[in-house]
Amino acid sequence: LVNDVADIAVHSLKDVPALIDPQFSIAATLPREDYGDALLLREGLTIDDLSKNLKIATSGPRRKSQLLSMNSKLNIVPIRGNIQTRINKINTDNLDGLIVAKAALNRLKIVHPNMYLFSEDQMLPAAAQGAIGIEINTVELESQLGNLLKLLNDESTYQATQIERMVVASLEGNCLSPISALCKIDAQNAELQVRVSSQDGSKVYNEEVKFNLDNKIDALESFIETLIKNGAKEIIQQ
């Protein structure tokens, strides 16, 4: 898009910075997949073993901090590669477990024999997790592609992910910040949960709000003000 060699970019929306160049915009989102995080465990282990000093791989500070808040003695190690490569590393790298997005497993039709799906209370997802976003050059292509992309757009997913990303941007966070945000929309009613953590998981702050979408701007401004007043920015920097 930047070099003008493509008209449309399709992203895993959770990996797109919350603040993007005003020249571009997320013009549409596809219906959201499962937004949860999955723990793939070595054979013989169960979720109850998470209370032990297990070696768990994850590439994200958000997941790491929430894991450490459950058990500070866990050995959290970074991991890279595509999904299948990561799964193979459970054996090749002597891992006890690996955390991946459930949406990634679903899209690739991967079924792991020893999987645990975290509840929202245990691990709140990243903003826009499970959503596919379509980005365009707004200035040049809105008039040409706007109506077409509206046909692809899932409005509830679009609204929810925009709200989640707005929270991350307001906290000056990015893809690597230990910030979780999940918005659920039912008709015109929205429920937003936010969790921020320190890098080591020793501090966790949760906040939630319910509002009508007609009052979205005022409700979010007040909610974000509460987050900041209660030290959310400071916590994610620790």
Predicted regions and their residues:
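Small-molecule-sensing regulatory modules
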Residues: 69-238
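Mixed-charge, polar/low-complexity N-terminal
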Residues: 6-7, 20, 36-38, 80, ...
